[in-house]
Amino acid sequence: MVHFSGVQLLLMFALFALAVLLPVWAIRRIARAVPPACRAPGVAGGVGGLLLFTIVLLIIEAVNALYHFGRAAGEAARVISMSTDYLWPVVQTMIPDFAASFFLLIAIGALVFGRSPAALGAAVVCAWLGGPLVAILRTIYLGLPIELAGEPTGLLFLTVVVTLYLLFANRPALTYGTASGRRLAASRGGSADGARA
């Protein structure tokens, strides 16, 4: 059994926090350079608040998937170096985490750089593909049982909450210029082209 000292645990926590906070800071700076698709006086728009928190949740999920993918790739290299007979079974174990990383990074990119309803739709679809669907793939490929308090259920709940927020809240509607965001901007005397109202 592996035992970690307090300093090692603190270092791992600091590295994980840095791996999350540094991209969040960079994403906030980059995302604020791209104006929201619509503006309405008195209503927050652009990447910030709960929308930034939603992106942070997706970043945490993506960092976790990338970590598991990297760990599985290291184990795969070790097993393949011993015998190439196990190439496909070993590669199979990496497919879910690779898919999760891929789709979650697309969702994050769409939310940060996109300012259209299509970008919002792509982010929602990729969040579903990178979250619960990949967790179900993991149970299929790795033969893990589906438990009520397990990963697929938790990711399903998180993805439902994220989807409801992205589709029905005012900030994402204004940021990505959905029909409800354009109506809100028009009703408040704002603009629908990203210019300051």
Question: Which residue stretches match the model-derived regions?
Answer:
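Cytosolic juxtamembrane helix and N-cap/initiation of the first transmembrane helix
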Residues: 3, 17-67
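Hydrophobic core of alpha-helical transmembrane segments in multi-pass integral membrane proteins
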Residues: 13-26, 101, 105-108, 132-136, ...
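A loop-to-helix transmembrane entry motif
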Residues: 84-101
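Non-cytosolic membrane-interface motifs at loop->transmembrane helix junctions
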Residues: 144-154
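Short, strongly hydrophobic alpha-helical membrane anchors
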Residues: 1-7
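Juxtamembrane "helix-exit" motif on the non-cytosolic side of transmembrane helices
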Residues: 66-81, 134-146
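Cytosolic juxtamembrane helix at the C-terminal end of the final transmembrane segment
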Residues: 24-45, 108-123, 162-190
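Hydrophobic alpha-helical membrane segments
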Residues: 100-103, 119-142
